[in-house]
């Protein structure tokens, strides 16, 4: 048996004494009084900040939301099934933040920016606060560049600009998500980073959206943030802020970003659940008093930055679900008053086969034609006017039996214009194609066709124009104007294609 000599023992003790480093660590701790329903009440934690992250003994993390005189109300960012009454909790000294980097592009993540697509970790050197202040007045400039959605009804009559916030509102199953996802598909090749935030949706719906993005090849410039219906309320409440933090990261790096919140009604419901469990006083529809601030501080982060900050932009398309078309409910009116306009989707139009089911009469963009190229302004003004007159006449024509020829012609034109606004899902059109379509309709070239032939003719016309008159597209994309030369080319193409089409139909 080996024996230790006295001098060896003294050397070991001497080394230990020399290596001893006295370090005092002050940790702010507390004790769990009560836990359940995703909420924990903590005694102690005297110096905790509002919104600070706290860590439980079994490593669950929570956010301190209610700072009361004798306890702290914490919402859990996990199920917290292993937390026990009497266990200790420590304050971390950090406000909620997430890592950010270019590597997030093409990934599906949760509200804590952790990947959930099974493709391994994401490397990130920087981090951003989930809740950051919105850009101030001096940091912004007015919206002037178009954010093309690829949908004629929107780009012509309810134009969206880069840095705008445009609400998409409507009942369930009216195509709200389809409008938003088509807008993402249309950003292909436009150098726009897209963030799609899914809040409280079915996992199957989110999977369907991600599959569409992958098939269409748009995942390379898109980040999907998903918290499904079975996620804790805290994470559903945080998901939009996580998406905003990622979009901001790119915006401040002089890039253009588009963020979709699908949908904010679910976020408000998650926040209502948390607030009621924290015993905050309920207000209208049992929502807490600060539910307006919940959405305003999120949507104000969308901006068009000034030239001094690099002219980056963040365009927000929040989605809100209504109950049987009631836009005067609490959350819809709140979000309408925060955003720069709304696109109203109607269940009646959807069921009658008009898709996208946009009710042009009550939809509005408060940025207006500032967010359109000159060519679009030139052709879209007439379209708006004719559709408005058609809507008026249509209501009147239901009661009048004998209509004069002019009124009949106007009704026929209106029906064809309504037909040209119809589009299939995942088939966005370029601006040049939209200008062609609108010009053909408003100048009466479709009047001689049957309503059922309109769509087929327009598809063939766009293909024919691309192959036989490529200079038309060059003129519009380079000058952004519908010049006389472009008009001559278009008229020729319409006449040539009309002759071919009518011959085709006869045979």
Curated annotation (Swiss-Prot):
Residues where ATP binds: 170-177
Enzyme class: translocase
Catalytic activity entry: ATP + H2O + 4 H(+)(in) = ADP + phosphate + 5 H(+)(out)
Superkingdom of origin organism: Eukaryota
Record-level Gene Ontology MF annotations: ADP binding; ATP binding; proton-transporting ATP synthase activity, rotational mechanism
InterPro entries attached to this UniProt entry: ATP_synth_asu-like_sf (IPR023366), ATP_synth_asu_C (IPR000793), ATP_synth_asu_C_sf (IPR038376), ATP_synth_F1_a_nt-bd_dom (IPR033732), ATP_synth_F1_asu (IPR005294), ATPase_a/bsu_AS (IPR020003), ATPase_F1/V1/A1_a/bsu_N (IPR004100), ATPase_F1/V1/A1_a/bsu_N_sf (IPR036121)
GO CC annotation terms, alphabetical: chloroplast thylakoid membrane; proton-transporting ATP synthase complex
PROSITE patterns: ATPASE_ALPHA_BETA
Physiological role: Produces ATP from ADP in the presence of a proton gradient across the membrane. The alpha chain is a regulatory subunit.
Subunit description: F-type ATPases have 2 components, CF(1) - the catalytic core - and CF(0) - the membrane proton channel. CF(1) has five subunits: alpha(3), beta(3), gamma(1), delta(1), epsilon(1). CF(0) has four main subunits: a, b, b' and c.
Stated name of the protein: ATP synthase subunit alpha, chloroplastic
Organism: Ranunculus macranthus
């Amino acid at each position: 048996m080996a024996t230790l000599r006295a001098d060896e023992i003294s050397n070991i003790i001497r080394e230990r004494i020399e290596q001893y480093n006295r370090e005092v660590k002050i940790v702010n701790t507390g004790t769990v009084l009560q836990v359940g329903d995703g909420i924990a009440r903590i005694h102690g934690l005297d110096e905790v900040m509002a919104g600070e992250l706290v860590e439980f003994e079994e490593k669950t993390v929570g956010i301190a939301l209610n700072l009361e005189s004798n306890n702290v109300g914490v919402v859990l960012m996990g199920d917290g099934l292993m937390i026990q009454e009497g266990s200790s909790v420590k304050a971390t000294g950090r406000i909620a933040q997430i890592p950010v980097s270019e590597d997030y592009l093409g990934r599906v993540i949760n509200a804590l920016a952790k990947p959930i697509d099974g493709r391994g970790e994401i490397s990130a050197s920087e981090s951003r606060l989930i809740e950051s202040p919105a850009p101030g007045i001096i940091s912004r400039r007015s919206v002037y560049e178009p954010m093309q959605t690829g949908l004629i009804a929107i780009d012509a009559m309810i134009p969206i600009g880069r840095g705008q916030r445009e609400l998409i509102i409507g009942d369930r199953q009216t195509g709200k998500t389809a409008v938003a996802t088509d807008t993402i598909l249309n950003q292909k090749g436009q150098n726009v980073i897209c963030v799609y935030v899914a809040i409280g949706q079915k996992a199957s719906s989110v999977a369907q959206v991600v599959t569409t993005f992958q098939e269409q090849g748009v995942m390379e410039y898109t980040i999907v943030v998903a918290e499904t219906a079975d996620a804790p309320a805290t994470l559903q409440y945080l998901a939009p802020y996580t998406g905003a933090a990622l979009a901001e990261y790119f915006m401040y790096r002089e890039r253009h970003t588009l963020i979709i919140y699908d949908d904010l009604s679910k976020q408000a419901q998650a926040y209502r659940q948390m607030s009621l469990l924290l015993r905050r006083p309920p207000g209208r529809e049992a929502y807490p008093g600060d539910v307006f601030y919940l959405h305003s501080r999120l949507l104000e982060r969308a901006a068009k930055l000034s030239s001094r900050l690099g002219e980056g932009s963040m365009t927000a398309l929040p989605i809100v679900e209504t109950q049987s078309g009631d836009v005067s409910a609490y959350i819809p009116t709140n979000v309408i008053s925060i955003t720069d306009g709304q696109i109203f989707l109607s269940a009646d139009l959807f069921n009658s086969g008009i898709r996208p089911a946009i009710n042009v009469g009550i939809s509005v963009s408060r940025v207006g034609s500032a967010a359109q190229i000159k060519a679009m302004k030139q052709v879209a003004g007439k379209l708006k006017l004719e559709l408005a007159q058609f809507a008026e006449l249509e209501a009147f024509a239901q009661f009048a039996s004998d209509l004069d020829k002019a009124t009949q012609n106007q009704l026929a034109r209106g029906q064809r214009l309504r037909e040209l606004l119809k589009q299939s899902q995942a088939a966005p059109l370029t601006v040049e194609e939209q200008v062609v379509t609108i010009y053909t309709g408003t100048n009466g070239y479709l009047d001689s066709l049957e309503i059922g032939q309109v769509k087929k003719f327009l598809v063939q016309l766009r293909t024919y124009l691309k192959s036989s008159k490529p200079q038309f597209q060059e003129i519009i994309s380079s000058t952004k104007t519908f010049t006389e030369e472009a008009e001559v080319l278009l008229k020729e193409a319409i006449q040539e294609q009309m002759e071919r089409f009518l011959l085709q139909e006869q045979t």
